[in-house]
């Protein structure tokens, strides 16, 4: 597969902040963007949960995302499993596979999956350190098979600035959809991240 993925700084930062805030929990979220030929452009990320994803809250989140972001498509899913449940390098959880399959069917094109991990992801509660967080990017094709996308990005000033921003404790400000359901006054869109 000759596809590429462009992850903008806002989406990158939201994913990082979500994982940093919930160091001892699994984190899940959705990727918003578009597909242009063989290029996937991820414009935003919506943190969903720092626990398990359940049907009714997930459906409410999807409905609200479609309402607040009418010009964006849900093109993928991200997950950070703190307890290393992966059986082998690059394995994808059943939950991620199922959600990506639904996203792909709804869009009529392949969906993205970002697996977030640190060098020591098996150590529950170990704080993420700068330059120790990694993304593995996959595309679920129409044959229901995940393909790894080697999408090495040169470190540029914008991403370095966002990484530094994440490391300076702004993670306490990120709100996932679970937290919004507990307190509707909280901003699940995380508009403070630009």
Where are these regions (language model features)?
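MPN/JAMM (Mov34/JAB) isopeptidase/deubiquitinase module and associated MPN-bearing subunits/adaptors
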Residues: 1-75, 80-194
């Amino acid at each position: 597969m000759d596809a590429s993925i462009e992850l903008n700084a806002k989406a990158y930062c939201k994913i990082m902040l979500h994982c940093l805030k919930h160091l001892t929990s699994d984190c899940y979220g959705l990727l918003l963007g578009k597909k242009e030929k063989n290029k996937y452009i991820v414009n935003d990320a919506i943190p969903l949960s720092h626990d398990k994803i359940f049907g009714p809250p997930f459906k409410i989140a999807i409905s609200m995302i479609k309402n607040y972001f009418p010009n964006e498509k849900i093109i993928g899913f991200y997950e950070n499993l703190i307890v290393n449940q992966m059986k082998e390098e690059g394995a994808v959880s059943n939950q991620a596979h199922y959600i990506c399959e639904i996203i792909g069917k709804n869009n009529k094109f392949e969906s993205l999956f970002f697996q977030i991990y640190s060098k020591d992801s098996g150590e529950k509660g170990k704080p993420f350190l700068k330059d120790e967080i990694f993304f593995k990017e996959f595309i679920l094709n129409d044959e229901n098979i995940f393909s790894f996308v080697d999408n090495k990005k040169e470190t540029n000033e914008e991403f370095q600035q966002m990484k530094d921003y994440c490391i300076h404790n702004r993670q306490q400000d990120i709100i996932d959809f679970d937290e919004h359901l507990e307190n509707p006054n909280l901003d699940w869109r995380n508009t403070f991240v630009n």
